[in-house]
Every structure is written in C-alpha cells, then in structure tokens.
C-alpha cells in the first residue's frame, strides 16, 4: 500500500494501516502525512501523528527547499535529487535507515526509513523526489517483499498487472508519441486483438494492449513507472 501524502489521518485509518502491516503487508508513507485530523487539528506531537508508532519516526521539522536549489539523498550508493521538499526526522532505535540526506542543512540525517511490524514493514519517505528518484526506493521495497522489480525508463509508459486465481492480466499503455517495445518473458494473448505475443510486444504511439497469461507462466516482475511532474 502506497500513501504518497496522507495529510489527514483519523484513528480508523491508522488502525487499518497497522493491521495491514502486522498481517504481512508493506506500507510506504510519503512526506507531509499524518499532520492533522478531519477537523484540521494538528495531531499532538506533530507529524506523522497517529502513524508515529507504526513508522517509528517523528518529523522534527518540515524543510521546504528554496526555488532554484536542489538537495540530494544517498540511497544504496545512488544519488537521488530532491527539488522541493525534505524533512528533518528523528528515528526510534528499531528503525532502519535506508536513505540519508547527502547535502544541505540535513546532510547525514535519515531520509528514507523502514520499520518491521508484525509480519510486514512500514516505510517512510521524507522527501519529494524528481520522477526517477522513486525508482530505487520502490525497487528496494519490492525486493524486501520478495517481489522482483523490472524497470522501464520511459516515463510515458505504464504497465500494471491484475490477477485472478488462474490468470495474470497485464495492461500496457503507451502515453507517448513514439512507438515502444517491451520484452516479455512469457507467451501471452492480447485480449483486445486476439494476437499472441512471445518475447516482445510492440506498441504504437498511444497504443494499448492487455496481455493474458496463465499464472504459472505469468510475467514474473513488477514494472516501475515514475509519474510525470505535470501529470
């Protein structure tokens, strides 16, 4: 479950998210979350409010980045760009720091954290990245959940998989003006055209395909697509 900016948090929401994680779910919470209740009253202790115990972090100070400046985060050896928003975090002893600020006033402080809870884990992302910056973060989340991740670097491409008990349905959408080609590791049938594809799928500009494959032969990865800034 990904909650990019859950500004308003009430107790039922916090309880549901905790139950989800403790049952084995993976929760990713974005910056400026858990700030107020439904009446716009700031939670005692500040953000992330009712999610504080689950995430194991406290936002000591919200740290907007001035226009024209950028800061950076070191994430497993990769340098991620932060153009607009960061937060000063205090973390509990049982929290694992996955990414660290690598410039500016927050240099050396935690930026992305993970805390185990029950059978799952709760992650907090304290910065607003540029679109490509989320790729290594979600690669890490998927890997820790035992889900291989395959990336497509074209921000105008979207790939989403849905499934029932027997079949995976993978939706390919090309939002761009140029054709794109995908490598697919399993034979599949396009439900829109009836065509069978093996190894490769080519989509024209603004093209769409819905590929169906048996679960045993289904595409064994998730594809990460960064959101366009002007979307």
What function would you assign to each model-found segment?
Residues 5-231:
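A conserved amphipathic helix/loop scaffold
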